[in-house]
């Protein structure tokens, strides 16, 4: 199997899909990454855990429709070209 641009894009799509399907109450709260985490005081930078939670929330919010479109295109391409 050759390492091509298509396989790189497909791996990135799988990673974004993995982030998008993480459910907050079912999975993230069980490992201690729920929304009840406090964000430090005024002037303090948020920790890495809260930054990762913001990233996961942002990916789920912003990438919902584009992921549906890109996943559909990928499925059609795989069906057509194997």
UniProtKB/Swiss-Prot annotation:
It is a multi-pass membrane protein. GO terms for biological process: brain development; cell maturation; chromatin organization; endoplasmic reticulum organization; gene expression; glucose homeostasis; insulin metabolic process; negative regulation of apoptotic process. One of its GO terms (cellular component) is Golgi apparatus. Its main location: endoplasmic reticulum. Keywords: Endoplasmic reticulum, Membrane, Protein transport, Transmembrane, Transmembrane helix, Transport. Signal peptide: none annotated. The keyword Protein transport applies. It comes from the Eukaryota. The chain crosses the membrane at residues 2-22, 62-82. It is found in: Endoplasmic reticulum membrane. InterPro entries: Yos1 (IPR013880). Regulator of endoplasmic reticulum secretion that acts as a key determinant of brain size. Required for secretion of extracellular matrix proteins. Required for correct brain development by depositing sufficient extracellular matrix proteins for tissue integrity and the proliferation of neural progenitors. Acts as a regulator of the unfolded protein response (UPR). Belongs to the YOS1 family. PANTHER family: IMMEDIATE EARLY RESPONSE 3-INTERACTING PROTEIN 1. This is Immediate early response 3-interacting protein 1. It comes from Mus musculus.
């Amino acid at each position: 199997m050759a390492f091509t641009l298509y396989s790189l894009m497909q791996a990135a799509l799988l990673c974004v899909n993995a982030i998008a399907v993480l459910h907050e109450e079912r999975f993230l709260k069980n490992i201690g990454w729920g929304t009840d985490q406090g964000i430090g005081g005024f002037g303090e930078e948020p920790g890495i855990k809260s930054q990762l939670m913001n990233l996961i929330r942002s990916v789920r919010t912003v990438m919902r429709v584009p992921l549906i479109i890109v996943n559909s295109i990928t499925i059609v391409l795989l069906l057509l070209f194997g």
